[in-house]
């Protein structure tokens, strides 16, 4: 049997999508650990994205067709800890220039490539790009969908060295280091686009 599309025919409800845009109230945080011979003397750092954008296209009847893109401005990442303000400025400057090289790499991106729904959880295979290097990362995303807002939370860990980044070293002879593994916590709040 041959099916011929009819111009102007209504599209199947299963293909109808709802588009959500990330709100500034969303929270994107990076947590670092410490390593090295004198790692005990170092600090774990909490880094917050102050500028980001993102879009979620959700297909309620076919969640596996849904997709998401998130972009984080690297020059708007800000170190929140340790509590010493002078130290925060110093660590933020080192992160932007020595670690992320924001002059050459202005964004970090996360883009879904496959989605599988299980209850209120989505298993997402995503492409994560940092410093022009891309790796696939598996995500488990908890999703709550209200009438006008989607909320999604996930946590994932990547190794800086996978993206050509040498973890920051400081202290006497580089004996205090940031650990290679960094953890991203995302709490996305996304209003429905009209």
Question: How should each PLM-predicted stretch be described?
Answer:
Residues 9-194:
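Low-complexity, acidic/polar, glycine-enriched regions of mature
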């Amino acid at each position: 049997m041959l099916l011929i599309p009819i111009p102007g025919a209504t599209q199947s409800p299963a293909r109808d999508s709802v588009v959500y845009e990330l709100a500034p109230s969303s929270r994107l945080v990076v947590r670092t650990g410490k390593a090295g011979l004198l790692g005990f003397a170092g600090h774990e750092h909490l880094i917050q994205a102050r500028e980001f954008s993102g879009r979620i296209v959700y297909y309620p009847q076919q969640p596996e067709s849904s997709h998401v893109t998130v972009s984080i401005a690297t020059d708007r990442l800000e170190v929140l800890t340790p509590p010493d303000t002078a130290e925060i400025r110093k660590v933020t400057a080192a992160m932007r220039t020595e670690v992320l090289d924001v002059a050459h790499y202005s964004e970090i991106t996360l883009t879904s490539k496959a989605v599988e729904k299980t209850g209120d959880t989505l298993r997402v295979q995503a492409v994560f790009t940092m410093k022009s290097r891309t790796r696939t990362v598996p995500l488990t995303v908890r999703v709550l969908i209200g009438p006008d807002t989607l909320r999604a939370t996930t946590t994932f860990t990547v190794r800086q060295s996978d993206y050509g980044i040498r973890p920051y070293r400081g202290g006497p002879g580089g004996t205090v280091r940031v650990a290679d593994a960094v953890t991203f916590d995302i709490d996305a709040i996304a209003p429905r686009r009209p």
